[in-house]
Each structure stands twice: as C-alpha cells, then as structure tokens.
Amino acid sequence: MSRDVRAEKLAISLLILSLFLIFQLVAEIYLNNGDQYHTETSPFTRGRSHVTRVPNHDASLSIPFLDKINQFWHVGGATQIRNIQSIKLTQDRDQDKHGLVLSNGIGDNTINDFEIVFTFRISHDPTTQLTGDGMCFAITPENGFLTQNLQSSYAKKQYMMNSQGVIADNTDLMGFPKNLPGLFIVLDTYRNQGHDHKEVPFMDVFINVAPESDWYDINSDGELSTSLRLNSRGHIKLKKNALWNRVTKLRIIYLESISFLKIDVQYAKEGNYWIELFQTTENLYLPKNMHTGQRYIGCSALNGQLTETVELLDVSTSEFHWNDMDASIEDTYDYAKEAELFLEQEFGEVLDREPDEFTKWKMIKAQPNIKTGSQSAEQKTSNNPHSRLFKVVLTIWHYSEILLLIMGIYLFSACIRVFQRRFKKIRSRRKRAGSHSVGLLPM
C-alpha cells in the first residue's frame, strides 16, 4: 500500500509541474501573439544588451577648454574661461551678472538616448551668510538668442516670431531667457519668497514646450511659473554642507525611446556614489529644434545683489545606441526592449513597457508640442515604497523561469532517487525470492 501512495504523490507532483510549465508557455504565446516587434527577453536567452554607451565628444567639455569652446560651444554674459582650470560663469562680489555656455550645434547634438554629467563648484566668502542667485542646467531646442544680432527692436521682434516668443535679452532663468523651451533644472541658492533661508539650496525640474505663453518666475522661486514643474510635491532639497565649496556632479539620464528621465547628484564630500533626486517614466518628450532635430546642452549662473562663484569644471555626454544597427531601429519595440535591458544592467532601473504603451508613446512623440496641461509627470523616486515594491515584483517575475527550472531539477532528482530506491527494493526482493526457491525436487 505504501508503494502505491508514494507513486501517487510522485505522479501528482509531476502533473502539477507539467501543467504549470504548459500554462507558462501558453501565456507567453498568448501575450505575444500578433506582436510584430516582440523581442525574446527570457532569462535563458538574454545576455548583455545590444545597446551600448558611445561618448559624444562634440557635446562634452573638458580641460583644455578653449579648443572645444571655440569649435562647439557658445559663450554668453560675463563668463571667464581659464583654459586649464575652470569656466567661471559668475564671480563672488560681482553683482547683477550672469554667465552661460551652450552647445552651438556645429558638432553632434542629435541626442535621443543619452547621459550628461555636469561637474561644477559653487563657492563664496565663508563670512557671508546669504548668497545668490543660483544656476541652471538646460537641454533646449533653441540657441539663437546667443548668435543673432539683436541690437535693434526690429531684430528682437523678428527673432521672437521665429523662436515662438523667446525673450532673448532676459536672464531670469539663472542666466537663460525665462521662457526658454526645453528641460531646465534650476539649482536655487537664494530664497526670494519668504524669509526661511534655511531651505536653500534646493532644486526644481521644469519643462517648457510653449515659450510664447510659459515661463519661469524667479521672484517666487519657481512657484508661480507657468512652465510645467515636474516635481510638483515641492522643492527637491540639496545638502548644503556637502555642496558649498565642494566639487559636485549632476547627472541627467534621458531615454527618449522608452520615455525615461532620471536626475542624480554626487557629492564629492560623501563619496563616489549617486543619489537620486528625481525620476519619471511618464510620457515626457524633450523638444528638439524643428529645423535641425538637435537638442542643445547648456549651463548658466546668475548673480543678483547677492553673489557667489559658480565654476563649470566638466561636461561629459554619452549616447546610447544599438551596436552596428541603423538609427531607424531606435523607433521600434525591439529597440525599446533592448533599451530597458540596458537601463537595468547599467543603472539598476527596471522598466517593462507593453506594446500598447509603446504605441501610445510613439503617438505622443509625433505631436511633441502639445502641452501636457497641469497634470504632473510626477517622479517615481527611490523613496517611493510602491516603486520599490513594483521593482521587486517585476524582478521576481523576470527570473521566475529560472526558479521554475530549479524546482524542476529538484523534483526530477527526487524522482530519480525514489525510482532508485524502488529499483533496489525490487531487486532485493527478487533475490530473496530466488534464494527461497532453490532446493532438491521432491522424490
């Protein structure tokens, strides 16, 4: 009887395992049925992503500065370039001045999936309690306000018409025009609204796709801006003691292919690791120049009555491309899945866009200048417990087949051990039965 019970349990275990594996197979076939862009992402077949990092030297800045500046960058305001030291955008005790650098588009500024790392330093007289005003990091489709002769009122009006209203001689956006289109990250070092100066420095992330009607409001520290502020829950706080008079890095990661934006900071005082400040996977499109398809990279700083020294030390730009493939593939679902795999392997971020979500994103990109309204593309930061839970669940799902394989191997080995024992018992019984039957025949 015990042999029958054991055999029944074994049969049930094998049946359950078989049904589960069949269910997994049918589910995959069903979910991917009709998907012409399906890319196999099984843990058994996926290795390193085909997407790799490619340095973009045209959109980068490093010592010595002058050669690169003369070739690929515009300089504005009171910027001072020290060839083997730094680019001083503003100088302490130099009131009501601004400085900026912005890529000129002569080099390669057609960037879609990319990482930009700005290295900078903000310093001031240690005896001074208050400093200002701050700095800005921009990715914009517009750089004509630095190149055109806008001395006459007619030239200014003509430029405003051609640029959808950009106010060329305004510097409210920490040195940039207040209605500059594109993505801009404001690092504010002085609180204009209210008297609580303990909150500085802080950061805000804005996007402007309608410069004729939207702008950044410096007097309210961005609070009354009509440009869309992505961090709608309040200012993003920065560490004052780690920022002042120290080398700091700000990293922008943007993958247009899967609509992913992430902003990190690295304080030299605290170590060689990144701290996430902002992240969103909402359908967020950074506008490109309508004529060239380029995005220009810039950095600026502004002094008011209060002053500080802002130095730009390095700009490092890398693009992400599929190895040895035409750029047209970067608009396909195949590439999107490879980009997700690259994002997971390179930055530890897990995304899983479905085909219908990808199709919706392509439709949004086809109409990039439609305003997203007041609804925020709110960040899904690492501080959000739901985001962490989602990543854990998604990671477990990605590797569920490996877990099933391990379970299958275990059950298979258990089956082998059971059969070996049964076989030994059967052999021993046969031997005993054979030994009892041997003897003399009756007379």
Swiss-Prot record:
One example GO MF annotation: D-mannose binding
First and last residue of the signal peptide: 1-27
Record keywords, A-Z: Membrane, Nucleus, Signal, Transmembrane, Transmembrane helix
Membrane topology: Single-pass type I membrane protein
Transmembrane domains' residue ranges: 399-420
Residues exposed to the Cytoplasmic side: 421-443
Predominant location category: nucleus
Residue ranges, Perinuclear space side: 28-398
Localization terms from the record: Nucleus membrane
Pfam families: Lectin_leg-like
Any Gene Ontology biological process: endoplasmic reticulum to Golgi vesicle-mediated transport
UniProt GO cellular component terms: COPII-coated ER to Golgi transport vesicle; endoplasmic reticulum membrane; endoplasmic reticulum-Golgi intermediate compartment; fungal-type vacuole; Golgi membrane; nuclear envelope; nuclear membrane
Miscellaneous comment as given in the Swiss-Prot or TrEMBL entry: Present with 319 molecules/cell in log phase SD medium.
PANTHER family: RE50040P, VESICULAR MANNOSE-BINDING LECTIN
Protein name: Protein UIP5
